[in-house]
Amino acid sequence: MATIFSRIVAGEIPCYKVAEDDKFFAFLDINPMVKGHTLVIPKQEVDYIFDLSDNDLAAMQVFAKKVALAIGKAFPCKKVGQAVLGLEVPHAHIHLIPMQSEADMLFSNPKLKLSPDEFTEIASKISAAM
């Protein structure tokens, strides 16, 4: 059975897309910790990020870097943090989170509640910065 992320890539489930190439896809986290919180995934359905081939893992990091630089332009911050957890969705993914402090990376923090219009605006700002 396809993961929710594979279904997003296939267009079966809507998302707020930020960027895409032939191997990778970036979209906003629907339960963001801060504005600009983005997920980067391989289009190939792989549960554990370290099960990706060396080439695909390296390429995913290069893609994530492009997205992170755009996030930093769209949402000025001290740094864009990166986290790989992968326990909730069995599909490898990288969280990219604009940070003003390390506290912005605490996944136990309350999540933002944003409207569809806010999500659309955020995704557009990041895409435009790419």
Region roles according to the model:
Residues 1-130:
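HIT superfamily nucleotide-processing domains
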